[in-house]
């Protein structure tokens, strides 16, 4: 029901009781006085007094009552609007937003567990995914492709400029030499080469290259000699010789080729670290990347391809992005529930945030409440308050009428005690 209608109905009820009390009082004035008539008259009188007193109290809150002397104590809410705003802001600051109250609230409710329980529900995780997809969809519709492409290109170029290519390469190689991991890499390479040379296709390829070399460099001998037979047997000899060498390197941890590989690796690391020529080559590679048309065209097309893929995925019923977000949210919730230390850490961070933020935030909110109330029109504010709590205030008038009538009855009965029980009879 509309608040205005409820307020008017409550006012009519309170006024009706006042009019009934007044009418009853007037009627008793014209009736012959007796015990009952005088009693009804006393009840009506007291009811009118209670109704009028509470009417004045309620009306004085919102409007000025033009009664000499006491009129300056009426229209309490409009007159004290600014003070009400300041006191309301101060009340909220002291009772709800002080640091200790917020910390106690965090400790009492353990928000990390509440968050975990909420996210662990698949329906809630999917809801988060759906909302994020809507935000993402709106972002994709509003973005300027040309600007995004330029931004992406500048970001990649800046990242390339910041990379110390020679230093990073040296660091990576140096990390590979720890615990002889580079020798493990060499072992893997040797094993792959041995397996490759043992294949028939590899031997046929070597034989073909030998035959081609003979035909190219020694065409006369190639016509006289059985080139195919020579190629096949030479391929076998080459493969067996290389396999034997690789097998020796693989078995002998102190093989001279391993030492040569060590020296070459450490020499390359030293060059990457200290050789200006190597640094210049690295810078040249970076410049080439930034100026290469194919690379820059790829960067420009990357955003468009990503944007189209996202739009198609977002609009599909079985969106993979939505599913991933939902899974991530559910995993986050389940992790919070299962990990006591993580929850304690998160709650601790929230408490620290409350200590840092609460004073400034509460002061800001206090000023905001006070300034907002001060900016309101006094009469409009009074009407809004009356509209929201006026119905209950009208029942104060109703209760004043009823309580006044009851008090009038009690006082009348007390006044009749001497007549009912004369002292001379005792």
Swiss-Prot record:
GO cellular component terms attached to this protein's record: plasma membrane
Disulfide partners: none
Transmembrane segments: 13-33, 42-62, 403-423
Keywords recorded for this protein, A-Z: Cell membrane, Membrane, Transmembrane, Transmembrane helix
Locations listed in the record: Cell membrane
Topology term for the membrane: Multi-pass membrane protein
Keyword flag Transmembrane helix: yes
InterPro entries membership: DUF445
Pfam families found in the cross-reference section: DUF445
The keyword Transmembrane helix appears for this protein: yes
Name of protein: Uncharacterized protein YjiN
Species: Escherichia coli (strain K12)
